[in-house]
Amino acid sequence: KSGILANYSKKNLLVNNDLFSLDLILGDNLRYNLNYFVDNGFYISYGLRSSYNHFRANSKFKPIVSQNPNVSKINLQYTDITNQIFFQTTFSRKFALGAGLEQKHIEATTETVQINNVETVFDNSNYYNVFGYLKLDTYDQKYFVTKGFLADLNFKWYVSSSDYNNNFKSFAQAKGTIGFAATFWDKLTFQTTHEAGFTLN
């Protein structure tokens, strides 16, 4: 697969303290990421994000493969469109706390297995979610870290859905990354990073 990446960034697009960015990937699998953020410093900041991701892939999708002995793989077509609005506040430029609303559309289909010449649809639903996050970054450098802490904690609650398959149940997911770095004897640096997550339903 091949693609061309195009990026556009602009400060002060609508107001003096905003930042707009758009990443667009043109190719076999079209994708984009759009971000708009109004940074009010220690006051409440706000923004929006929008993304589109589409791809085709050969997959050993067990529910289909197990029911069709003559099929070893299916050609899966997957589309994810996500839109978010959020609010954020910061403390000392190193600690950020935010929350927002999300609308996500997921469509997954295959033409490998058809019924009456109609493609099989695994999902074609809209999901409505709320999310929150906490970020702490006291690392002294971006790449070659010698000291500091990092915490990136995220929580998302899938509240409701248009429920194409009539089997949706509300659930929540939490995940996080925690890191630590320290330097000993001026030249030896120890850095560790841990990730974890779980689902509640």
Sequence positions of predicted segments:
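Gram-negative/organellar outer-membrane beta-barrel architecture
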Residues: 1-131
